[in-house]
C-alpha cells in the first residue's frame, strides 16, 4: 500500500457512500465487500502515516456499509482508532463521534451511544456546524426513543429547526 493507492481507495469510498443511497445500492455493497480488505489496508496506511483526517473520513464513509453488512463492531474499531489519533479537524471528529454513536446504538450499547452522540452534539454546537448538530440530535433521538417518546420528539423537532436554518 502506498499513498496513491490509499487515496484512490478513499475516493472509491466517497463514491460508494453516495451510490449506497441510490438505485444501485446492491451493486455498490457488493463492490465494497469485494474490496473490504483493500479498504481496511488503506485505512491502516492512512492512520499509520499521520493522515488521521483522511482515515477518519474513510471510517465515517464506510460506517453505514459496515452497519448494513453486520460489521458494526469493525466500524466501531475503525472509528475508535481514528478518534484516538490526534485529529486537527474538529468537524471530522464530531462526525466520527456521531457515526460511532450510531454503530453503538445498533449494537444495543445505548449508554455509550448517548455519550458519543452527546459529545458530537457538544462539539458541533461549539463549531456552529448545523448539519452535524442535526445529525447528533437525530442520533440521540433514536436512542432515547426506546425510553422517552416526548424527549425523542423534542430532540427530533430541534433537529428539524436546525436543518431548516441551514442552506444545505
Put a short name on every predicted segment.
Residues 1-4, 8-12, 19, 23:
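Short secondary-structure boundary elements
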Residues 2, 6, 26-100:
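Short, well-ordered secondary-structure microsegments
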Residues 5, 39-42, 75, 79-82, ...:
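Tetratricopeptide repeat
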Residues 8-11, 41, 48, 61, ...:
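The canonical alpha-helical register within tetratricopeptide repeats
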Residues 19, 56-69, 92-109, 122, ...:
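Tandem amphipathic alpha-helical repeat scaffolds
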Residues 28, 35, 48, 68, ...:
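Alpha-helix C-terminal capping/termination sites
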Residues 46, 66, 86, 120, ...:
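Eukaryotic all-alpha helical interaction scaffolds
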